[in-house]
Amino acid sequence: MSWSKVKYFFFDTPEEKEAAQYSYEKEQTDMKKQQDPPEQQDVPFAKVQPKQNVVSIETAKQSSKVVLLEPRTYSEAQGISDHLKGRRAVVINLQRMSTDQAVRIVDFLSGTVYAIGGDIQKIGPKTFMCTPENVDIVGAISELFGEEEETNIKRW
């Protein structure tokens, strides 16, 4: 390998010599010809309204209902749950049922109330109030139901 090849390898190559022979015209760019950035335009937008905690009295009056029920069989539990899903409070009197079926209904309704985020409270002997999440229960009824409740202590 000759010294000239090494020289071309590191320093000057024949292609560079050819490129140096050509003359390039320098392009001048006109700064005025370049596009200016577009002007900012006002774009209308919808104003986001914060969620209001105020409900009109007429709306609350129409949607608030309490359903009084006295089921006689366990098969009526699904109908009671449908009232709860419809956001209506339900008062259930279970005195005309056998204790076993009453316990099953209370278990079923407890699951329903839990699923919808509501509440269930005992308001008397074999009488319960189930409420959906849109109804608040305030206060408590004392347990002065008499001796009947004390003798029948099985589950509730």
UniProtKB/Swiss-Prot annotation:
It is found in: Cytoplasm. One of its GO terms (cellular component) is cytoplasm. Pfam families: SepF. The keyword Zinc-finger does not apply. Cell division protein that is part of the divisome complex and is recruited early to the Z-ring. Probably stimulates Z-ring formation, perhaps through the cross-linking of FtsZ protofilaments. Its function overlaps with FtsA. Belongs to the SepF family. PANTHER family: CELL DIVISION PROTEIN SEPF (PTHR35798:SF1). This is Cell division protein SepF. The lineage of its organism: Bacteria, Bacillati, Bacillota, Bacilli, Bacillales.
